[in-house]
Curated annotation (Swiss-Prot):
Belongs to the papillomaviridae E2 protein family. The keyword DNA-binding applies. The keyword Transcription applies. It is found in: Host nucleus. This is Regulatory protein E2. Plays a role in the initiation of viral DNA replication. A dimer of E2 interacts with a dimer of E1 in order to improve specificity of E1 DNA binding activity. Once the complex recognizes and binds DNA at specific sites, the E2 dimer is removed from DNA. E2 also regulates viral transcription through binding to the E2RE response element (5'-ACCNNNNNNGGT-3') present in multiple copies in the regulatory regions of the viral genome. Activates or represses transcription depending on E2RE's position with regards to proximal promoter elements including the TATA-box. Residues 207-304 are annotated as: Disordered. Binds DNA as homodimer. Interacts with protein E1; this interaction greatly increases E1 DNA-binding activity. Interacts with protein L1; this interaction enhances E2-dependent replication and transcription activation. Interacts with protein L2; this interaction inhibits E2 transcriptional activity but not DNA replication function E2. Interacts with protein E7; this interaction inhibits E7 oncogenic activity. Interacts with host TAF1; this interaction modulates E2-dependent transcriptional regulation. Interacts with host BRD4; this interaction mediates E2 transcriptional activation function. Phosphorylated. Sumoylation plays a regulatory role in E2 transcriptional activity. There is a cross-link at K328 (Glycyl lysine isopeptide (Lys-Gly) (interchain with G-Cter in SUMO)). It holds the Pfam family PPV_E2_N.
Amino acid sequence: MESLVARFDALQEAILTHIESQESTLESQIQYWENIRKENAIMHYARKQGLTKLGLQPLPTLAVTEYNAKQAIQIHLTLQSLLKSPFASERWTLTDVSAELINTSPQNCLKKGGYDVAVWFDNDRQNAMLYTNWDFLYYQDMNEQWHKVKGEVDYDGLYFTDHTGERAYFTLFSSDAQRFSRTGLWTVHFKTQVISSPIVSSTYSSSFDTEEQQLPGPSTSYSEVTEQASPTRRRKPRKSDATSTTSPETEGVRLRRRRREGKSGPGSGETPRKRRRGGGRGGGETELGSAPSPAEVGSRHRQVERQGLSRLGLLQAEARDPPMILLKGTANSLKCWRYRKVNSNCCNFLFMSTVWNWVGDCSHNHSRMLIAFDSTDQRDAFVKHNLFPKLCTYTYGSLNSL
């Protein structure tokens, strides 16, 4: 036991010497975390043997020593991998490779050059929140190749552009706006720049319901925002496809116009609309062309009847099936990722399943997890704004019942 105490004292002396030296090379930081790993391993072993002290040093609980040891091993392996990258020759301080910095958002990334981003909700300086962004972020891709990117800011949140050109958001301002903002608008202040709301539209607020939104028909809130932001992307329909190509807005207006004309009686000169026998529980008749409202998208839990439906009718019927994402990966990574999402007030999904696997599947990434959504738009936003676990793959699908 005396030899264990002597080794423990020697490790603590080496750790204190490194802190006082203030070295800034990656090799020295790797040596520091190797000493931290050995220190926590000794404390964990001593705690398992029933000891509460090593010399004059009180020992934490088994759970704490186990967590600290695993964290030190992870950081030590991460820095050893970084040593093989082109960024190994950069200046790396003890703060740059600290566990606290690695565990801040975005997690499992190395960060340098932090700066504040102030968000004024309702454009009120007294109703503001501070977020931290980074000049440089270092992360590994699925092939364990290191990449260096810049932390960026836009009206929606904080993000970086990965090596594939995709935006990866790690902070969204809308979640805090739901709690602290009355109007749902905010301004972003960072460095010498100010970003204001690009569009002021009542379609973002559910309290301003118009008659057109209550009528069944295609939802036009997204198309309205897109067209206001990029008016040059509109194109005029050609004469040859004027009868077959319509925008969501004109389709919604046409459906509403047909409902009115159907009520005008025989004097209007219109032929009766075609009807088909519905396959629902009521056995009634369903109008062709009645698209699902936004609240109905993803709400169907039955197999769609494919006979007697046009292509448009089939698309509208299938829009009510709840869309899914199937995640494939290791059990531990999926469980940890699910725990973070469930406890981060992330409301942009419907349900998350437990981690499960197929019977007889002995592959490395044999674990599975399902995520259900209210609509395909919600699913696309979830994929855009969330990073999946390392070495994890996903695929789209839908179920007839949840």
